[in-house]
């Protein structure tokens, strides 16, 4: 079988498992989640106006700085969300770049407190919490994030009934993660084992980006990829 024919055979025999649904437009988070991302919720002044905003952790009360053409001053570092306010975040894209946008909400009023590139923050989040499988296998980040993992030489993929337990376990774990996230897609080509009994495979896994900023979901996704080896 030549290379072109093999590529075609792999495409035709890759197994696809989908948790169908519309990726959520936004997700509610806690102030603890914000800290896990590396930010504090601040009550202070932005361009001289008293308001709430997010600042990278490590700054102190009284600190003043300029960033992105705006001036900031910290009056208080909050330990809880302000009364009657909730924290929501969603993903926006501009010129091919995904941004995470966090807002404080009270009724119909939204106050944007954070807007930063999602790929950079997501990678920092994975590394900070030692989610090495997610960090090492991150492929691309938009509204949907792709992870891609490959082991060994490619050959004709095996059918589902011939998958070993380790591959089936991964699919089961992935399904549970996708139900938590509300959407997901796994494309798996399992090629068999090497002479040393190592698994040969390639897998692409799609998950909603905003859901990956939930530590519980990311930890379970990391475990799923980690155990598939």
Curated annotation (Swiss-Prot):
InterPro entries: UPF0128 (IPR005266). Belongs to the UPF0128 family. This is UPF0128 protein aq_756. The lineage of its organism: Bacteria, Pseudomonadati, Aquificota, Aquificia, Aquificales.
């Amino acid at each position: 079988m030549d290379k072109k024919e093999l590529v075609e055979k792999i495409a035709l025999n890759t197994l696809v498992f989908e948790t169908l649904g519309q990726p959520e437009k936004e997700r509610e988070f806690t102030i603890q989640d914000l800290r896990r991302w590396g930010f504090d919720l601040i009550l202070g002044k932005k361009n001289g106006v008293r308001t709430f905003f997010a600042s990278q952790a490590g700054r102190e009360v009284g600190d003043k700085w300029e960033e992105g053409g705006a001036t900031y001053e910290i009056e208080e570092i909050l330990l809880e969300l302000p009364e009657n306010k909730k924290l929501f975040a969603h993903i926006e894209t501009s010129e091919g770049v995904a941004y995470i946008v966090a807002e404080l909400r009270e009724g119909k009023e939204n106050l944007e407190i954070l807007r930063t590139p999602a790929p950079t923050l997501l990678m920092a989040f994975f590394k900070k919490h030692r989610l090495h499988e997610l960090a090492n296998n991150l492929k691309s980040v938009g509204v949907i994030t792709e992870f891609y993992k490959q082991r060994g030489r490619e050959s004709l993929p095996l059918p589902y009934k011939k998958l070993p337990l380790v591959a089936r376990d991964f699919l089961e774990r992935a399904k549970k993660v996708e139900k938590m996230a509300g959407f997901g897609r796994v494309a798996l080509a399992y090629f068999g084992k090497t002479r040393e009994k190592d698994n040969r495979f390639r897998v692409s896994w799609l998950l909603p980006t905003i859901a990956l900023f939930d530590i519980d979901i990311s930890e379970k996704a990391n475990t799923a990829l980690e155990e598939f080896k």
